[in-house]
Amino acid sequence: MGPTLAGQNARVARTPCQFRPGFSPKVPRVSRRDQIKLSEEELLALLEEERVAIVSSQGPRGRPHSMPMWFVPRQGEIWIWTYARSQKVKNLERDPRATVLVETGREYQELRGASIEAEAEIHRDPATVLAFAEELTLRYAEGISALEGDAKAALEAQAPKRVAIRFKPVRTASWDHRKLGGTY
């Protein structure tokens, strides 16, 4: 004879979930992950608000190479600029897979962020690099709305040594612990 339930000799047809304490087929369970996930609008707002992203690529010895970078969000994508001969560029030339982390909050109940798995696309065209450099500078410079004179000349001098990198999201995990309402 087969296995018995609760010492009975006959099999009782039950689904495994009926044995969980508190199970109710009429009340759908919401996972914590779904509860704290950012909506598309919340994610875009976070990317607009925050100023530093941690960009991680695979280093030459196979370990993560993570660097803080200023960035510009463009329609859900992350763009940065860096020196063309930097380690992160060498890493992304070898393997374009990257993870970009944008987060904020000091206390657990304040934590909010997104971990974006992405494919990196390196742009070397001087016009593209310069246009992006201007956009990045305007995002971070306070009190200016246009680049002129010495500021523009400085960017033009740096652009030939730089690249712009576009991170196209493949998968995003996000969280906003404020949505937990103090319960953990």
Predicted segments, located by residue:
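Short, basic/aromatic recognition patches
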Residues: 32-53
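Short beta-strand segments
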Residues: 50-84, 92, 99-104, 112
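Charged, gly/pro-rich active-site loop segments
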Residues: 23, 27-38, 111-184
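AMP-binding (ANL) adenylation modules
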Residues: 107
